Amino acid sequence: ILLALCAGSGSGVLLATKWQLSALPQIVALLNGIGGLASALIVCCPFKYHKDNLLESLCVVIGLVAFSGSIVAFAKLHGLLRKNVAWLKWVSLFLEILLLINIAYFTYFQQGFAGIILLSILIGFCAIMPIGGADMPVIISLLNSFSGWAVVTVGLLAGDLLLIITGTLVGASGTILSYVMCKSMNRSLLKIVWPETQSIETEHKSTGIV
């Protein structure tokens, strides 16, 4: 445990000192993803305190959506992903199909995490990919809340009050911050998370002109 603490602390210090301050959004997105992945990995391990298959599956979904979505946000902010409007127009439809499949998996197949892991990663990717850079601060804050709620589910499974409290603080603060930013932008969170095809095309065309 001490070795893991030293490795994690050293990596965090190295990450914070080597990157410039202008790259702070990318760092926050990356740390959000790592937090969500950690929660999902803990639940996937065969610990003896696991009691609720539904709660375990919920933790995996929230954690991996936060992880894959944060990786996409990091890559977009860092300029690693190219924008292709031709296939982005179909991402929303594909996301709806994935959500329906995930609901069906929750209902009929509650044993095992293989299907949920794959679906959650794809959902996180498809949900964040169409979103433009102007809305990315809201998305990063929302993903931050996801990582906090994933910690809450781990705390509920483990019966750990400290995890529940800290996860609730992170989740609630991220949710409130997302709401405040949407209100200041005079936009709906649903419109940001689920952008229309026309707005995607308009944004990418204006980005190309600039």
Language model regions located:
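Transmembrane alpha-helix boundary signature
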Residues: 1-2, 14-25, 40-53
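Structural signature of hydrophobic alpha-helical transmembrane segments
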Residues: 1-9, 52-67, 109-119
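Cytoplasmic-side transmembrane-helix entry/capping segments in multi-pass membrane proteins
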Residues: 2-4, 23-35, 82-95, 137-146
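Mid-bilayer segments of alpha-helical transmembrane spans in multi-pass integral membrane proteins
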Residues: 9-14, 33-45, 56-72, 180
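C-terminal ends of transmembrane helices
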Residues: 10-28, 70-84, 123-136, 178-182
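Transmembrane helix-loop junctions at the membrane interface of multipass transporters and ion channels
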Residues: 44-51, 108-112, 133, 138, ...
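Structural signal for the N-terminal portions of transmembrane helices
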Residues: 50-64, 154-176
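Membrane-interfacial segments at transmembrane helix termini in multi-pass membrane proteins
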Residues: 169-210
